[in-house]
Amino acid sequence: MKAFTQHTGLVCPLDRANVDTDQIIPKQFLKSIKRTGFGPNLFDEWRYLDVGQPNQDNSKRPINKDFVLNFPRYQGASVLLARENFGCGSSREHAPWALDEYGFRTVIAPSFADIFFNNSFKNGLLPIVLKDEEVDALFEQAEATEGYQLTVDLDAQTVTRPDGVQYSFEVDAFRKHCLLNGLDDIGLTLQDQDAIRAFEAKHQQSSPWLFGAIK
C-alpha cells in the first residue's frame, strides 16, 4: 500500500451530497477482483453520456462536458472535495480503488459513510472530515481560483490553504500509523513474520501429530 505522509495537489470540487458507491464505480465494473483497471470508469455514469461496459475503449465514448472531472482546469486533480455522506450505499472496495487509480490521494468532506471510510484507510486513500463551514470555504475558493491547491499533512493532521489558513482534522492513531508507513492488513501481518514462524516451529514440536501427512 502506498504511504501517505504529506501531499500537495490540485483540488477538484464535486458539489454533490450523498454520492454513493454505485455512482463512484457502477456495478457492471465489479466483476474483477484485481485492484487495477477501475480508474478509467470512476464516476462513469456522470463522466460519459452512454452506458459504460468493462474493457470498453473510453476514448470513443461521448463525454459529458458539464461534469466537473471533465473540465480542463481540473485535469490532474489529486484532492477531491465533496459534500456530506460521501461513499454511502453498498459496500465495495472497488470505490476507493477507483478513486486511487484515477489519481486522488485524499477526499475531503463534512462526513462519510462508515464502510467507505474504513475501506479508504485500508487502501491508502485518506478520508478527511472537516467542519461544514470549512468545507464551504474550500468550495468557494476552489471554484473561484483556477489551479487551486491544498496541502495535506497527515503527521500534523492539517489541511493548509494557499493563503496559509490551516484546518485541523482528527484521525485514529492506528489508522494514522498504517497510512504513514504504507501498511495494509498484509503489511501489518508481515511485520510479525518472525514471531509467526517461531510459533509455528514451536507448535510443530509440541503437537507433531497435527502436522503429519494426510493419507
Curated annotation (Swiss-Prot):
Entry coiled-coil feature ranges: none
GO molecular function, one term: 3-isopropylmalate dehydratase activity
Enzyme Commission number: 4.2.1.33
Pathway: Amino-acid biosynthesis; L-leucine biosynthesis; L-leucine from 3-methyl-2-oxobutanoate: step 2/4
InterPro entries associated with the record: 3-IsopropMal_deHydase_ssu, Aconitase/3IPM_dehydase_swvl, AconitaseA/IPMdHydase_ssu_swvl, IPMI_Swivel, LeuD
Top enzyme category: lyase
GO BP annotation list: L-leucine biosynthetic process
Record's catalysed reaction(s): (2R,3S)-3-isopropylmalate = (2S)-2-isopropylmalate
Signal peptide: none
Keywords: Amino-acid biosynthesis, Branched-chain amino acid biosynthesis, Leucine biosynthesis, Lyase
Pfam families: Aconitase_C (PF00694)
HAMAP family in the record: LeuD_type1
NCBIfam families in UniProt: leuD (TIGR00171), PRK01641.1 (NF002458)
Self-association and partners: Heterodimer of LeuC and LeuD.
Functional summary from the UniProt entry: Catalyzes the isomerization between 2-isopropylmalate and 3-isopropylmalate, via the formation of 2-isopropylmaleate.
Family affiliation: Belongs to the LeuD family. LeuD type 1 subfamily.
Protein name stated in the entry: 3-isopropylmalate dehydratase small subunit
